[in-house]
Amino acid sequence: MGLVVVGLALLDISLWWLVLDYFIEEADATHKAVMITTTMLTFGMGASTQALFARVGGGIFTKAADVGADLVGKVEAGIPEDDPRNPATIADNVGDNVGDVAGMGADLYESYCGSVLATAALGAAAFIASPELQFNAILAPMLIAALGVILSLLGIFLVKTKEGATQLQLLRSLDRGINTSSVLIVVASFIVIHLLGLSYWICGSVITGLLTGIVIGKATEYYTSHAYRPTQDIAGSAETGPATVIIKGIGTGMISTAIPVITIVVGIILAYLFAAEMDMGNMSMGLYGVGIAAVGMLSTLGI
């Protein structure tokens, strides 16, 4: 699903750019670029609106179908879960596809499109005084995202495990693919920035985004995998009854948000400073760096 999401996102963005470039008439090339990029932001708003309904509505339908099927099947009829004799199993399977495939795909699609489109708009505004660099700044996030798709293909082929592998081994295999693609994307970003004539400081923002994504992924893995202590502690709390499981689970869930929040804040500050060349007053370049960091973070989305 990851490759479908990023492929459709880049295809849609490219097509809309060509359409708007044909229909928008503006004598000044720099102002035309600003018009196109700001107009394309509405594309991201539409994707976000659709993702809201698909993700939230799909999640509610998924859980309702799941609980309903279990109540009828296990409690009332006494048959196993997902048994074909239970008609509610059909709704349960449909709900899994709606919530876990359509909803998640729409969510990732709008995040991916939003990062690329916002960065392009910020680039158009930051380099409005230089037509050549302005177009290159608009092109940079799209090229980084496109190279990320290609390099993600290589990472996918590195995700291999043996039969009967444990969950920890599966996670290590996935890490191998993501880490390899991330390193290659850093190298590719340096080449892209060099060819486009932009400041090498922007590469620091790309690296910041990639590292931020990796840290958030590791934190999520630590707090949700049964191979690590937090989940094991929640399971162990069941020895004293369901109340302690709920309390321990809520507490662990609250603590687990600390690392991602702190990482995102630090990542935003570093990405801003790198692109602004350590000048806090250079807001236009700093915001462009934050956008580039978001593109870098999502460049491995195909995996």
Give the location of each predicted region.
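Hydrophobic packing and interface segments
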Residues: 1-303
